[in-house]
Amino acid sequence: MDAREIIEMIAKAKKKTPIVAYIKGDLAGIDFSSFKFFGDEKFGILFGEYEDFKKLLEEHKEKIEDYHLEVKARNSALPLADITKYKARIEPGAIIRDMVEIGEGAVIMMGAVINVGAVIGEGTMIDMNAVIGGRAIIGKKCHIGAGAVIAGVIEPPSAKPVVIEDEVVVGANAVILEGVTVGKGAVVAAGAVVTKDVPPYTVVAGVPARVIKQIDERTKEKTKIVDELRNLE
């Protein structure tokens, strides 16, 4: 997705502050048409917008005895994705923005964050607390380690997105900076900071990362992707 398209969409989107409110009181006769309402004349649960709830409280303060408010976001421009559309394993606590592509058999672990415009290939695992920035492109059968950061490039809009090709393994807490391409089958060591392109089938390590060797059979065995973890049945 083009950065300028994302920027224009965010700029023009109606900003939302979604809430869940639990209210009790004499609720008979109150107009809840601005909300999704579940309840009866004494207690109800409301899903809606904060400004609408403020107005409701002001208009019916004599009837509402008590309430508890949960604010999900403030002036949010983009919703979270409907994860039911993905043929992937998505664990509790993952945060995925709308307009993210996730391939079949991918695995998104607890605490992972994936921003708008990102693409996750088939069979790729995004491990716990990894951050995939806006417009990042990750290929098939990759493993992005726990706590890794794949930089996003929505601002500035001219920046080139990160591209991680197929069958790449990125170690825990590694950082891939804007504009970098990591070639097919490469391995990025844990904690590395990658500032320039990584050739295919090489191992890079360090800060800044540099090539330390070519992929060999021992490295392949240590970084092997386990297909059983991608099984959705």
From Swiss-Prot:
Which Pfam family, any one of them, does this sequence belong to? DapH_N
Q: Keyword Transferase on this protein?
A: yes
> What family is this?
Belongs to the transferase hexapeptide repeat family. DapH subfamily.
InterPro entries found in the cross-reference section: DapH, DapH_N, Hexapep, Hexapep_transf_CS, Trans_hexapeptide_repeat, Trimer_LpxA-like_sf
GO MF annotations in UniProt: tetrahydrodipicolinate N-acetyltransferase activity
- Keyword field: Acyltransferase, Amino-acid biosynthesis, Diaminopimelate biosynthesis, Lysine biosynthesis, Repeat, Transferase
Q: Record's superkingdom?
A: Bacteria
Q: What job does this protein perform?
A: Catalyzes the transfer of an acetyl group from acetyl-CoA to tetrahydrodipicolinate.
HAMAP family, alphabetized: DapH (MF_01691)
Reaction(s) catalysed by this chain, per the record, are: (S)-2,3,4,5-tetrahydrodipicolinate + acetyl-CoA + H2O = L-2-acetamido-6-oxoheptanedioate + CoA
Where, by residue number, does the polypeptide cross the bilayer? Answer: none
> What protein am I looking at?
2,3,4,5-tetrahydropyridine-2,6-dicarboxylate N-acetyltransferase
Give the metabolic or biological pathway: Amino-acid biosynthesis; L-lysine biosynthesis via DAP pathway; LL-2,6-diaminopimelate from (S)-tetrahydrodipicolinate (acetylase route): step 1/3
Please give the PANTHER family that the UniProt record associates with this protein.
2,3,4,5-TETRAHYDROPYRIDINE-2,6-DICARBOXYLATE N-ACETYLTRANSFERASE, ACETYLTRANSFERASE
* CDD domains found in the cross-reference section: LbH_THP_succinylT (cd03350)
Which pairs of Cys residues are joined through disulfide bonds in the record? Answer: none
BP terms from Gene Ontology: diaminopimelate biosynthetic process; lysine biosynthetic process via diaminopimelate
E.C. no? 2.3.1.89
Matching NCBIfam families, A to Z? Answer: DapD_Ac
